[in-house]
Amino acid sequence: MTKKYDITLYGFGYVGQAVWRFLRGHYQIQVFDPYYQGQPVEGAEIGKNKKVVAKTRYAVVCVPTPMRKDNTCDTSIVEDVIKNSNHDYYLIKSTIVPGTTERLVKNTKKKIAFSPEYIGEGKYEIPFWKDMPHPTDMKLHNFHIFGGSRTVTKKWVEVWQRVAGWSPIFAQTDSTTAELVKYMENSFLATKKIFCDEFYNIAESLGVDYNELKELWLLDGRMGRSMTLIYPESRGFDGKCLPKDVNAIVKRVEEEGYNPALLKQVLNSNKKFRDETLP
């Protein structure tokens, strides 16, 4: 007897696995990832042949959107999934530049929403009870954002509410705003990290201990503790998200004729800090 699935999940990387863990207790999840090479995950059947992907009403897209050589965001895998599959409702969790969902809806005539992901690969345990998204468990997130036409976002809110319950905020907006908020967040975190790197150098030049300075600064609750640790041997920011996303939003708004001077300086300062401390 053929197994009946509720939701198809495209992509089983870090974000895809978090979405799978979130949904699995309430829905039958069909996973498709032809490039998955990780360890087997108990309870997850990972399909690699697109021809045997069953049609489900809902599909969640969690595929990579890497940075191209010209620093733009490569959305080709997302677009391929949506154009070459057949589902009633799509939710994109991959980070994509503003305007992508709107363009895909126009070109494919499909019902697509976007939801920024808040799953992180950081090294530190984040106290989710302090208004921060839990780094690995979406069931502990206190908000979920859905962008798109209201008829489509309402469907996805219904899917999510059956898992998350009544406690979180379910915010609905247009897709471009939902896409941009992810870039605003990561650009702010990158800027804050460079700001703290700069003040580390300022403190050093004045004979002041940065960690002592930092703790006094953080007595003001408006500052926030994230991104304030500085390691002399590894300065600036790195990883899979911040460099990619800051570069991508810079390139995207340049296409609209705007010069994001602050973010460009953040990238230049980051390169300087990285070059000075890495072998």
Q: Model-derived features: where do they sit?
A:
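Conserved beta-strand termini and adjacent loop/short-helix elements that scaffold enzyme active sites
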Residues: 32-34, 47-49, 113-115, 172-175, ...
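Short glycine-/acidic-enriched loop or helix-start segments at secondary-structure transitions
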Residues: 19, 41, 70-71, 100-103, ...
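NAD(P)+-binding Rossmann beta1-loop-alpha1 motif at the extreme N-terminus of oxidoreductases
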Residues: 1-51
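Rossmann-fold dinucleotide-binding core
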Residues: 63, 87-89, 95-178, 249
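Rossmann-like NAD(P)-binding element
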Residues: 46-89
